[in-house]
Amino acid sequence: MKNFMDENFLLQTETAQKLYHEHAAKMPIIDYHCHLIPQMVADDYKFKSLTEIWLGGDHYKWRAMRTNGVDERYCTGKDTTDWEKFEKWAETVPYTFRNPLYHWTHLELKTAFGIDKILSPKTAREIYDECNEKLAQPEYSARGMMRRYHVEVVCTTDDPIDSLEYHIQTRESGFEIKMLPTWRPDKAMAVEVPADFRAYVEKLSAVSGVTISNFDDMIAALRKRHDFFAEQGCRLSDHGIEEFYAEDYTDAEIKAIFNKVYGGAELTKEEILKFKSAMLVIFGEMDWEKGWTQQFHYGAIRNNNTKMFKLLGPDTGFDSIGEFTTAKAMSKFLDRLNVNGKLTKTILYNLNPCANEVIATMLGNFQDGSIAGKIQFGSGWWFLDQKDGMEKQMNALSVLGLLSRFVGMLTDSRSFLSYPRHEYFRRTLCNLVGRDVENGEIPVSEMDRVNQMIEDISYNNAKNFFKF
């Protein structure tokens, strides 16, 4: 029987162990997609308690706690103390066997705080106090955590109207770790609620200095902000979409749709889809002009619980995997850009694992030889960001594409304690490849190439792909 979470955690063969310890573990972290709050990095934020850094905003843990019968006040309530919230999490942890939260929890305790104890009601107070003592030390600040995990680059997620003042402040402070913005223009195509769209466009006008009275004006304002993001080091865009949009439309139609929604009138479903289709193409062309990588996270059904959405707002643990038939639209969208010679580097992230092979085969349709792995299958996202999901994603990519050109892992997290997910991924990767070597499916004579592949997927591919 193996010990829990020892140095060979998840590494089931000798080859896997060598691959991880001698090659994957030493590589720095490039976290090219996350949701860290830039101000916390700029201010080198000092965390007040383990609850704040660990439970604050963590909807993964909140979902588990609710499922375990914990009252909402201990998840998001304002009338409970940090200790009371942590105590309820500690009571939940023993019920999370086989859930990735159990592994993440103990990996984070071990790598961040040097704690090997199992979190339970019996150990909760001891662990809480020990972690809080360490969090009071300078090396456990926001920047300290990034240094601790050998982070080299982080890319935050930012709206076109964001000032990026904290990115600028961080860079000018001389902080050695790069914090770069990512262009996330979802609100610029969110035309479902006319009043919200108009309010956003008015903010865009104010920030860009462009008077907006028609569609062309809005695009001019967005281009100006796109240029500003590029000046601040942006290399990627990101789009959170339910499904891909690829309706047929004319320029005249899109201009008329803008006038209608900007004037306060509700759009038909067809008009909404046409507008989103046009905007995705325009954003794709902008990214191509600058050599950026466009990312698409698709397939989530968000805010399912109306009661809790009204109470807590979005991103609080009430989203789930959707079931959308989107392969044809995805193909049509990518083809539109490709036909015009404006398909930039692209990463596709699915939330429904049923689409793994759909994406893995879609990649090959649009690889053009200009760069290795130009169209990428993104690492297991959200509900798939765990051992089983990672293995399925990498297996599909291996069978139908080139695993060796994969740009690897990202945290997609709001937490400064999420960097061990890179270790979790690397261990899973090494175990997967190591097993093939041990089974005689990869020749031992090619170990130098295998070793290089592990280092590339862990770090080198991302560094070269994004030109950091």
UniProtKB/Swiss-Prot annotation:
EC number: 5.3.1.12
GO molecular function annotations of the record: glucuronate isomerase activity
Keywords carried by this UniProt record: Isomerase
Catalyzed chemical reaction(s): D-glucuronate = D-fructuronate; aldehydo-D-galacturonate = keto-D-tagaturonate
Pathway(s) this gene product operates in, as recorded in its UniProt entry: Carbohydrate metabolism; pentose and glucuronate interconversion
EC class (word): isomerase
One GO BP: D-glucuronate catabolic process
Recorded superkingdom: Bacteria
Xref: HAMAP family: UxaC
Family: Belongs to the metallo-dependent hydrolases superfamily. Uronate isomerase family.
Protein name, as recorded: Uronate isomerase
Species of origin: Bacteroides thetaiotaomicron (strain ATCC 29148 / DSM 2079 / JCM 5827 / CCUG 10774 / NCTC 10582 / VPI-5482 / E50)
